[in-house]
């Protein structure tokens, strides 16, 4: 069936966007989609009725945003999208001057040159290690709809984040504290996969038909032993909870491609069959986000009514907002 992307446009009031993170993540709210019941996230473990398998994305947001001044005058911002090798990276570049191949920039702490120009991004060659640049000069990149404030940075990574190279957080995990994870681990199994979230996650759909939208590509990896646990859970009819759309896309890709690592541009549409997950926990997504296609898939045509209900109930949306739990019917 052909779907129009205008189905995924809705009115999101500015005051429904949580500009500030929950200082205590357990104070956030959880909407249980099936019953429309709203609970405090701290009580999440109480609704897990039988031993289950939980899949989290542990990819860590790196300090990829570098804001500095050119020695010649004027500010400059470099946003590292992905590292090619020790000294080369694909980046976004914000500077008032004309950007041409071969142009060199000098700053107090580092220098770089434009080696190639892509569609909206640049291949930059730096005179210092990019890892050193990230560690010494980088800032956490907050989403474009969140007002930048360094006091928010420490709340934008999950408590279990480790490894990987994400430039945006898999934010469904932000609701989980170490205490809640420990409580879940008593009767359930927890595994961590890796999907490196890239900046394409924020790009709204700009075509008329859903099938014409090209979703962003992201690197993923799953340990062999952990995928074995997923297979065992399916064989035993043990419920599987994917925490976040990135976890869902990674495990579905691994299943369909019979590959535990690689690059995925898997686009879950309303009529796509979901093979692995029984439940999806996710935040509320922005209008025209391709992720709303997943919401449409797991909840049905009335997903927008559920979103209206969440807004009317005072729930908060987007990265620092509240969460919703979907039961995925076969």
Model-based region annotation:
Residues 1-330:
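Surface-exposed, charge/polar-rich loops and edge strands
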């Amino acid at each position: 069936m052909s779907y129009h992307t205008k189905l995924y446009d809705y009115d999101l009031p500015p005051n429904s966007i949580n500009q500030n993170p929950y200082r205590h993540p357990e104070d956030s709210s959880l909407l249980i989609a099936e019953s429309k019941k709203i609970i405090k996230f701290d009580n999440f473990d109480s609704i897990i009725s039988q031993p289950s398998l939980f899949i989290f994305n542990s990819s860590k947001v790196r300090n990829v945003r570098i804001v500095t001044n050119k020695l010649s005058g004027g500010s400059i911002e470099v946003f590292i999208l992905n590292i090619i090798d020790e000294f080369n990276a694909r980046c976004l570049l914000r500077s008032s001057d004309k950007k041409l191949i071969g142009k060199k920039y000098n700053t107090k702490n580092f220098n770089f040159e434009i080696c190639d120009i892509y569609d909206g991004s640049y291949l930059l060659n730096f005179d210092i290690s990019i890892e050193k640049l990230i560690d010494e000069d980088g800032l956490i990149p907050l989403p474009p709809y969140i007002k930048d404030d360094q006091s928010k940075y420490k709340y934008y990574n999950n408590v279990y984040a480790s490894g990987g190279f994400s430039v945006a957080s898999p934010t469904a995990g932000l609701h989980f504290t170490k205490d809640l994870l420990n409580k879940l681990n008593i009767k359930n199994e927890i595994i961590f996969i890796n999907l490196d979230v890239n900046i394409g996650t924020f790009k709204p759909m700009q075509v008329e038909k859903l099938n014409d939208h090209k979703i962003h590509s992201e690197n993923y990896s799953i340990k062999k032993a952990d995928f074995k646990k997923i297979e065992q859970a399916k064989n035993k009819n043990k419920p599987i909870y994917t925490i976040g759309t990135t976890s869902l896309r990674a495990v579905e890709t691994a299943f369909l491609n019979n590959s535990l690592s690689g690059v995925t541009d898997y686009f879950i549409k309303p009529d796509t069959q979901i093979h692995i997950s029984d439940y999806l926990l996710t935040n509320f997504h922005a209008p025209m986000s391709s992720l709303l296609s997943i919401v449409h898939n797991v909840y049905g045509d009335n997903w927008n009514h559920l979103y209206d209900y969440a807004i009317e109930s005072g729930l908060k949306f987007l990265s620092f907002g509240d969460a919703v739990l979907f039961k995925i019917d076969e």
